[in-house]
Regions:
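Catalytic core of soluble alpha/beta enzymes
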Residues: 1-50, 79, 88
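Flexible C-terminal active-site loop/helix
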Residues: 6, 44-107
Length: 107
């Protein structure tokens, strides 16, 4: 909040795994948006489940204008036994129309 109020940031990179998930990420975005600071969603080494959450947040929030959500692509098996959630074609993510994050998890 302080970085926004003192005009110290042009954009804020929200990382779901560092901030604690979707709810804290939404709070960060709301503070940034109230102070006219754009956001992006970034990732570290998240699985496809976490990336699906991040991409869903990007799609839902007008103030989030950028995304770096490609960590799952570097896995030996990018699907990680969890098909669905989204498709990527030419860097464009298309979300599933299934409920929730749209991922099929079969343990």
């Amino acid at each position: 909040a302080k970085a926004c109020k003192i005009d110290a940031a042009d954009i804020i990179n929200i990382k779901l795994m560092k901030c604690g998930g979707l709810c804290p990420a939404e709070k960060i975005n709301a503070i940034a948006e109230a102070n006219h600071v754009q956001c992006m969603v970034g990732c570290m080494l998240e699985t496809k489940v976490a990336i699906a959450a991040g991409v869903s947040l990007v799609a839902a929030k007008q103030n989030i204008t950028e995304a770096d959500c490609d960590s799952f692509m570097y896995a030996v098996d990018p699907e990680m036994g969890m098909p669905g959630g989204f498709a990527v074609n030419g860097g464009v993510y298309t979300l599933s129309d299934k409920p929730g994050l749209g991922i099929d998890i079969d343990f």
